[in-house]
Amino acid sequence: VLDGERGICLDLSALEPVQGVENKIFHFDGRTLTPVEIRADGYYKLVPTESLPTLEINGVKMHRSKDIDPGEDARAKTALVVRPGDIVLDTCGGLGYSAVFAVKAGAVRVISTE
């Protein structure tokens, strides 16, 4: 596994502790792999999909990921409502997919809040 910015190489033996772990994304700090998750007022974790990850809170996915990837879902939804020149209020901003696709659809400003 390479870190493109610094060219760090991860020895494959470092992956042994996470071998077989499914539905989690890990962060590598240069020495160890740690699940990207939070355990405060609930359980939050990033879950991999075929493309962009989805956020899961207490077992509930925050993005559609069955038969569509979260990015394509956000693109399709924003294409229905955002027009060039729009100012968009994105509530429940989450991972920012809707905000990104609102800009790509021509929004001149996106105000995003969680």
Annotated model-derived regions:
Residues 1-49:
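N-terminal auxiliary segments of SAM/dcSAM-dependent transferases
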Residues 33-45, 57-59, 64-68, 95:
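Generic hydrophobic segment detector
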Residues 4, 56, 91-93:
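Generic detector of intrinsically disordered, low-complexity, polar/charged segments
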Residues 48-51, 92:
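Short hydrophobic/aromatic-rich motifs at helix boundaries and adjacent loops
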Residues 95-107:
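Conserved SAM-binding loop of SAM-dependent methyltransferases across substrates and taxa
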Residues 52-83:
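SAM-dependent Rossmann-like transferase core, predominantly class I methyltransferases
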Residues 109-114:
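Conserved SAM-binding motif I beta-strand of class I
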Residues 83-95:
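Conserved class I S-adenosyl-L-methionine
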